[in-house]
Amino acid sequence: TNGQASCLLAYGQSRKWGVWNAYNRVPIFIKCGDTTASWAPQGSLGVSNNSTNNKITPTVGLPEEFLDCTFTQEVALSIAATSAIQLGIGFDSTTVASGRTTIVGAALSGGQTITVAAWTGTARYVAQPSIGIHNIYPLDKLTNSGTVAGGEDDMLLLVTYRG
């Protein structure tokens, strides 16, 4: 609705901080994630759990603040061949990762298998100062078979800045 500002900081989907204080900036920590128990990522880089509601939308009033974005995800792979999950951060994009991505997985050969292997991966992007609002998405991609876990203890997209 026009004329209303949202300030959603608690864990959940579509988190945002819709105000800016130019004269008394304080640290702002916005966290986002999907509460679905687990899902298998898609075969190409895209928004986690294929939901564009998994995003953070910070408001920046002056082009002086860096946005420090971190995405941490627990990964479980059932491996009979090479399997991997790539994690990244989409800065104003639902398909292209910015900054440092990470690939979590294992390469097996000769009939080796791993029933379940669990890792935690982290992607990071520090956005240069700019003005306006941005949509920041957690991205994932699966090669072969595996799942990722939801909930704040297993999936966390965190954006910190001063505003």
Predicted regions and their residues:
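C-terminal interaction-tip segments
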Residues: A5-C7, Y11-T35, W39, T59, ...
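Intrinsically disordered, low-complexity, compositionally biased regions/tails
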Residues: C7, K16, A22, A37, ...
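Short beta-strands within extracellular/lumenal beta-sheet-rich domains
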Residues: G43-V60, A117-A123
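Short, conserved, surface-exposed binding loops centered on an aromatic residue
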Residues: T57-P63, S78-I79
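Terminal beta-strand-rich extracellular "head" domains
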Residues: F66-I131, L139-G163
